[in-house]
Every structure is written in C-alpha cells, then in structure tokens.
C-alpha cells in the first residue's frame, strides 16, 4: 500500500473512532462517586415507580377479600427473575463480588425493558400518571447504561455493553376487566416491585464498598 493511501486510511479510521474515544474519555473523567449517585437515583426512581404502580393497581382492580388468593396463585407467586441466581438475604448479598452484583442488576433491568413499555396501558385512566410508558422505558434504559458504565469502571475502565436477554417477562395485558388478565398483571407488578427492590439494594451495596463515605443507610 502506498504511503499516501496508508495515511489516508489511518486518518479516516481516526475520524470514525473519535466520537467513541471522546465519549470514553468523558466517562473516565467523571468521578466514580458521581456515576454511583446517578445510578442510585435512577434505581430509586425505578423502585418507587414499581411500588406506586403496584399499589395503584391493587387499589383499583383487586378486591380486598380476594387479595390473599391473588397473591398465592401460582401465576402471581413465581417471577422470571427466580431463574436468575440472586442473593436472597443480606448475608448472601455480602458474599457476592461487586461485579457479580452489578451483573445480576443488569440482568434484572434488561428483563423489564420490553414489558415496561406497556406498564401504564393496564389502567383505563392513563391520566393517573404524569409520565408515559416511554418515560418508564427510558428510565430503565438509562439505568442499564449506568450499570454498564460502572461495570467497565470497576473492571478495566472501559464501558461494558451487554446483550438484551432473549427471555424476558411477558407484556402487561390491557384487558383490565378479564380475570386472567388481572391475575397476570398483578403477578407482573409484584415481580417488578420485587426486582427493582433487589436492584436498588445491590447497587447500594456496591456503592458502599466502592465509594468512601457512602455507607450511610
């Protein structure tokens, strides 16, 4: 290859890589504590969203005298995330490494990326909320990217990108007057609340270990 052609090729390659290098450099200059603060904020918002939606659905559609039977139905008592090996108590959580906890959190978030697009469609009155399904999706997507960034920083400094799980939770059913649909949605919301609680707990543990002075919980 002629010297001029080689130079042109290298220049073109550098120009193509420049945006990625700039982004990677920008991430490296952000203090780890700030990355954790942002991830924890998003994790808390996701957990609160799950709590609020679960309570709203329960109050709107689940009769009080049927709540016990709904909760103990096999369709509502099993979560897809139960197939993902996760710590079940604080002692088990403490035995996991930071990267293990982040990987588990990432899997949990990715399992909800598609279902959360239909989260608010369950409610006949969508005016109950000020935000939309797309806002919920972008919240989880932002959290996913934040966890990937933290994994990269804790490993070797580069941002990690993972594959979306092929098997995830099913979509929420919009037929709010059908008993089977109510049962399905109630079970999904129970799992959503349970999983987001885990994500927030795991991230808090990793933050406590990684950032000095952040264990005040």
UniProtKB/Swiss-Prot annotation:
It comes from Homo sapiens (Human). The keyword 4Fe-4S does not apply. GO terms for cellular component: endoplasmic reticulum; endosome lumen; extracellular region; extracellular space; vesicle. Can be found in a monomeric as well as dimeric form. Pfam families: Hormone_1 (PF00103). GO terms for molecular function: growth factor activity; growth hormone receptor binding; hormone activity; metal ion binding. This is Chorionic somatomammotropin hormone 1. Belongs to the somatotropin/prolactin family. Produced only during pregnancy and is involved in stimulating lactation, fetal growth and metabolism. Does not interact with GHR but only activates PRLR through zinc-induced dimerization. The gene is CSH1. CSH1 sequence only differs from CSH2 sequence in 1 aa. Keywords: Disulfide bond, Hormone, Metal-binding, Secreted, Signal, Zinc. PROSITE patterns: SOMATOTROPIN_1 (PS00266), SOMATOTROPIN_2 (PS00338). It is found in: Secreted. Disulfide bonds join 79-191, 208-215. It comes from the Eukaryota.
């Amino acid at each position: 290859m002629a010297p001029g052609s080689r130079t042109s090729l290298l220049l073109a390659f550098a120009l193509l890589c420049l945006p990625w290098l700039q982004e990677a450099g920008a991430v490296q200059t952000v203090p780890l504590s700030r990355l954790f603060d942002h991830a924890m904020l998003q994790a808390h918002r996701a957990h609160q969203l799950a709590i609020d939606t679960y309570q709203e659905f329960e109050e709107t559609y689940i009769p009080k005298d049927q709540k016990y039977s709904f909760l103990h139905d096999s369709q509502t008592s099993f979560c897809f995330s139960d197939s993902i090996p996760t710590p079940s108590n604080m002692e088990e959580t403490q035995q996991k490494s930071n990267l293990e906890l982040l990987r588990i959190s990432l899997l949990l978030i990715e399992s909800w990326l598609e279902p959360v697009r239909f989260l608010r469609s369950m409610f006949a009155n969508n005016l109950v909320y000020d935000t939309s399904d797309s806002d919920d999706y972008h919240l989880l997507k932002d959290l996913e990217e934040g966890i990937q960034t933290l994994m990269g920083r804790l490993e070797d400094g580069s941002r990690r990108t993972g594959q979306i799980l092929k098997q995830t939770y099913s979509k929420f059913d919009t037929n709010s007057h059908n008993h089977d649909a109510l049962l399905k949605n109630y079970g999904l919301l129970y799992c959503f609340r349970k999983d987001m609680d885990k994500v927030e707990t795991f991230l808090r543990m990793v933050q406590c270990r990684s950032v000095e002075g952040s264990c005040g919980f």
